[in-house]
Amino acid sequence: MTAITLSNINKRFGEKVLFRDYSLHIEAGEFVAIKGESGAGKTTLLNIIGLLETPDSGSVTLCGARSPSFSSRAAVHLRRHKLSYLFQNYGLVDTDTVEANMKLATRFGKAKGKAEKERIADALAQVGLSGYERRKVYTLSGGEQQRVALAKI
């Protein structure tokens, strides 16, 4: 199943053309690395995929829903329920515990007490960090910190 399709995307900033008839297909479960020089358009590409920016022309299809028909409400729904975006800065409080950082994420704030602890434990298990709840973030490796950030989303 195709999760993300960009079809004939065009994007420019003034005279600078970032994308000309650019197309991309990403299947569900597929991992893709995006690399390029500074100013090449990597962030713009991710912003287009994340519905944070619109291309000048072309279409974006996410989980079967096709732009440009995305209303603001539909885009918000897709961003909340179908997309995850991990920034280069993980946004963790390094002097706090993993559990305290997890509680800052709104998806865990809805559950309280034992239910909240179980949701946090499940999310950490999914990223291979079972039992890390009481560890201080600054004691974790960069990769472990990244996995905590992934577990939060």
What role is predicted for each listed range?
Residues 4, 19-21, 78:
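Conserved structural motif at the start of ABC-family nucleotide-binding domains
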Residues 35-37:
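The feature captures the beta-strand-to-loop junction immediately N-terminal to the Walker
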Residues 50:
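Helix-to-loop junction immediately C-terminal to a conserved catalytic motif
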Residues 58-69:
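Conserved ABC transporter NBD signature motif
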Residues 66, 114-132:
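Conserved ABC ATPase "signature" region
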Residues 67-84:
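ABC ATPase NBD coupling module
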Residues 95-105:
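Short coil-to-helix segment of the ABC ATPase nucleotide-binding domain corresponding to the Q-loop/switch region
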Residues 136-140, 144-145:
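Conserved ABC ATPase signature
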